[in-house]
């Protein structure tokens, strides 16, 4: 069931926080979306003022956290979302309130932690910021101060990474505010089906993948891609990048969301490293979608493989 959203005078969607009645990872296992969202006015996308006082990230890492003026959209450090409780345990040792269980902290850094997803497999992990950030709608993610969480996820998930995704093809993904179940940003590190990889490479051969950022939102680079058996096709905007050195949240807003007058809170974003029989081919397919597209989707779950 979707929670109703509370309307407030904020530049973007105001989320309704979930209460942590069970372990955070357990909430990610097979349930429908629990968080509701509403369309809102244009967000504030300016860089944080130099004299603002960002909340220091737990662990005092090099990347700042969202300043106080972003808290209505990005969350407060005092929030009790289950996944944020997991961060507090991994970083500070703060035990989650019962009946939530202690998480298994697979990796910790100044900017993020990595946890098991649910179900717990060798190709289902979550990268979670140590900053309090609700999700993709947080405008701070689009600023130069934010950590590059997508590249961090890839560096861990790749073969030889600290928490490698053991699956022939890897996918990284984030759900929209409409479709996620927990109100703390998390990037799924999982598998993708061979058919997804093959479809993307076929689209590339047909020149149906944007290779310039300015073309990412163009209808000619929208393509239907089949997900799980029986789930049907979904439409995605497909871009190819040589690396993940740029902030994907910034690129998504600048080249897709803002030009079309869309809502960042309704976007899903997926990264599929190009793979061949020899391994990683040195580039990435970046897919975006939302419910403004015909047969679009607000979730990455159609393409990612968790079980």
Residues covered by each model-derived region:
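HIT superfamily nucleotide-processing domains
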Residues: 47-307
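Intrinsic-disorder/low-complexity regions
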Residues: 1-5, 41, 50, 174
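C-terminal segment of N-terminal export signals and the immediately downstream linker at the start
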Residues: 9, 31-61
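N-terminal secretory signal peptides
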Residues: 1-14, 18-32, 37
């Amino acid at each position: 069931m979707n929670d109703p959203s509370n309307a407030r005078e904020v530049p973007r969607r105001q989320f309704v926080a979930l209460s942590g009645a069970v372990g955070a990872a357990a909430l990610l296992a097979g349930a429908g979306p629990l968080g509701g969202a509403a369309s809102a006015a244009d967000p504030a996308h300016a860089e944080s003022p130099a004299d603002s006082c960002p909340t220091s990230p737990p662990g005092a890492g090099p990347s700042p956290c969202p300043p106080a003026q972003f808290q209505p959209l990005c969350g407060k450090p005092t929030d009790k979302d289950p996944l944020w409780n997991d961060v507090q345990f991994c970083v500070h040792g703060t035990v989650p309130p019962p009946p939530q269980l202690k998480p298994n902290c697979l990796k910790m850094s100044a900017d993020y932690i990595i946890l098991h997803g649910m179900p717990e497999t060798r190709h289902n992990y979550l990268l979670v910021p140590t900053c309090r950030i609700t999700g993709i709608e947080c405008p701070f993610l689009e600023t130069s101060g934010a950590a590059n969480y997508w590249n961090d996820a890839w560096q861990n998930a790749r073969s030889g990474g600290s928490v490698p995704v053991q699956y022939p093809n890897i996918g990284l993904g984030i759900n929209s505010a409409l479709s996620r179940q927990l109100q703390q940003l998390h990037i799924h590190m999982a598998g993708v089906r061979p058919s997804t990889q093959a479809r993307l490479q076929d689209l590339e051969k047909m020149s149906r993948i944007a290779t310039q950022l300015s073309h990412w939102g163009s209808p000619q680079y929208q393509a239907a891609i089949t997900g799980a058996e029986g789930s049907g096709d979904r439409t995605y905007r497909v871009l190819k990048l040589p690396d993940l050195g740029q902030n994907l949240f910034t690129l998504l807003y600048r080249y897709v969301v803002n030009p079309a007058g869309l809502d960042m809170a309704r976007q899903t974003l997926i990264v599929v490293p190009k793979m061949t029989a020899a391994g990683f081919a040195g580039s990435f397919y970046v897919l975006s979608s939302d419910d403004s597209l015909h047969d679009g989707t607000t979730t990455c779950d159609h393409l990612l493989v968790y079980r």
